[in-house]
Design a protein with these regions (language model features):
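N-terminal intrinsically disordered, cationic/polar leader segments
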Residues: 2-91
Length: 91
């Protein structure tokens, strides 16, 4: 039997809310790595990683027909995107 609109909305809320909360929690954990007393990082490489994350958010929003734009220093994140940024960050 096909689901009603109300059932689909309830299922979306049940599935999406914990996933969104989990994603937000992961961003907080990434932020915990900003303590310079405990960690050292390359600012240029880190910027590439954040662009990678922003593009993932843009792509996710696009799946919901939501147009999201981010800029970093006047440059659109899509123009800064490098697919291998995370692998390069680790090297």
């Amino acid at each position: 039997m096909a689901q009603t609109t109300a059932e689909k909305k309830a299922r979306f809320a049940r599935v999406a809310v914990p996933r969104i909360e989990s994603a937000v929690d992961l961003f907080r954990k990434i932020g915990n790595c900003s303590a310079k007393s405990n960690y050292e990082w390359d600012q240029f490489k880190l910027k590439k990683v954040f662009v990678h994350l922003l593009v993932a958010i843009q792509e996710c929003a696009a799946q919901f027909d939501i147009d999201v734009h981010f800029t970093i220093g006047q440059i659109d994140s899509k123009d800064l995107y490098e697919p291998n940024a995370i692998k390069e960050f680790l090297s």
